[in-house]
Amino acid sequence: MHRARAILQAAFYDYPVDDLYSLIFGEEEDIGTEFIKGMGLAVSVRDEDTNMASCELDVSRLGLINGDIFGNCFDKVGEFAHDMFEAVGSLKIQQNHLLKWREITRLIGEELLTTAYVAKYNIRTGLCWQDVREVDCPWLDRALKDGVCDIHSHLNASYDAYLINWIGLMNQIAGKAYFFDRLEHPKDNPVVLRDYHFADLYSWCILAAKIRCCLYEYFVKGGKSEAWFMEQMEVFSELRHLTYYNGLVEDVENSLIEQREKSKSIYQRDDILDYAIEMNMTPALLDSPYAVLSGERRIMYSFLMAYYHGHFRHSKIIQLAYLYERIKTEFRKELVQTNRKTGLVNFKLYNSSKDSFSKQEKGLKDVMRAYGTQTSLYKPNCFLEGRFCIRDAEDFMKLQYDKGILSKKTLNQYNGRVKYVIHLTRKNILNTNRLEIGRRNAWKDEINAFLFMHDQCKSFTGIDFAGSELYTRPETAAGTIRYARNHGINQITYHVGEDYYDLLDGLRAIDECIRFCEMDENCRLGHAMAMGVNANNFYRQNDSEIVLPRQYYLDNLVWMIKKSQEEGLHLDVELEKWALAEAERVYGEIGYVGHFNMDQYYASMLMRGDDIFDRPGDGPVQRQLWAYLTNNRIIENGNMPITMKVRKDYIKQVVRIQKAICRLVADKSICVESNLTSNVLISNVMRYDAHPIVSFRKIKGRTQKELKVTLGTDDKGVFATSLHNEYALLVTSMMKKKRKQGYEAWYDQHVADFIKHLAENSMNYRFQEWQ
């Protein structure tokens, strides 16, 4: 790990808040030495290639600059930011440093680093810069100049849930214990350095709200003494011994009420989102959606200006400012995906947390939605296709995203650049009855609601099936999609091939989606990672063992054989014998009646997407299908896990089928929606340049049709990204791979042409308005 990044991660991400609090408020005389020891341990735990002694030696240099080790953490922030930015005065990241920047900001965010850079070098800019830094790459800007659309964006996860929720908390902290209780278990376990003291996240946020209030009074408003600051903080000296915080919350909330009332009086407005926002900024800045963040930035900017330029050196207040930033990062861990655990189950922990503080506060929810929409349209050449559930449709229709969040002024630049897609959610539990009558009826009701919305607003252009694909196969959606098509809805996108037990299972899901849902050139596939994931790497990462439900195992084996036959693929004789024997064995274990007949079983698989109530007959295929759909014993046995030992010839066959599925998608002119950061964090792809989007571009179908691919953000708030950032990360990773491998990788012009092609696809394959 890069040394500077390791220190920043240890200081602002790993160092336990409890231990930090004990140092600052405790009776330890030499807190610098204790802090250095803790930092050394934190660095060595994350960086396994470095021994403890060298870590402590490197960290000890923090205390050699001016003797204030906590202040020197802020010096490290400023130095690192200086190295990352393109030039003094620019807020663009150097392209060759983008991946370094991304690795640390994924953990601690961009706000502190950018604010430190602006303050340290006294850059004359407003406090309304974009929340995700752009990269200095002129030809990328040229490639996107003719228009680019984010066609895979879930609007309820597109806002900065961390910062906006944080600002809401820092302005009203009382009565929020319930919201913290609703958070899932900690997403990234802390490195425990000392004895752990009881103090939950809510209590730390109460402390942070008080520190923030004091920083604002001292550095922004002025006129307060250092003695006043410390007197205000005295009440927290025994925080770790408290079990109930009623008195503490009341004291802090009174301070916040006082600040809000002062702001209301000064600006003659009742709708003050943050007492720290300067509402008298220039109209252009006040119109910006990023003005919402300007109050938080203003406080830290004022502190860092005083610190960096030698106007302030009070060590205890510096320590409290550092503690404030560390608590912010601890809160951020709950809302932005920072851990490296893969799979949708992990992602859903973050996705469910993002609304924990805003569900009951409509004003804050409206701010978030407007922010997410406007920040997706930050440039005139940007377009958006936003997705949300039907229950949120009315709120989004009423949302005045064309008005400034703070200025309330109509901003015509957003008009006509937003279209809406309604997503129908799949359930997240294993089936007990595969007929799913209740879900099918619910989806039909949602289609009817969509048609009603479409009659009122033509910006509703299509439907999307989202949620866990592990538990709801494409067969369940087939009838709903037929119903939608019969009512004029032909623009459909389907999340598929993103989350799977076995790579072959993901490929089967894509094939079933195309077959059962009759996907064509008007449709798109969301993610479809299984089509391009490196099969050898996938099975190596899983130690050549796959755990999956018996029913999936049986279906995969049968489908592998029959799909290979249909596509004319080579199938090793020994592999086919093994697959048939395994299928027959598992068929019996699940409890199906009668002798295993692969042709009959596969015929029943092909009928799963049909409306079985309209299909006559009572033959063996129909009975096989009915047992699969309704027999509780078979369903229960089929859901039981089984472990598959992966053979080498099996992997080779998976690769052949991957290519066949890619040809199928290309032949049908179905567009694939790729989402770089989302897929890297959720799937088994660990590097940007290993993302399937890079291999998709090489695919040529049997009719020489090229596979159509786009790039989107998915959930840009949860992943702390932007559409421009997604393109920049892809460009940078591809170019770095070129430099590493020389002539065998991509030339700059190849990369430029590819990026332009992605942008053009995003405009050509976005859903259009229809009558």
Predicted regions and their residues:
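Metal-cofactor-binding active-site regions of metalloenzymes
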Residues: 1-771
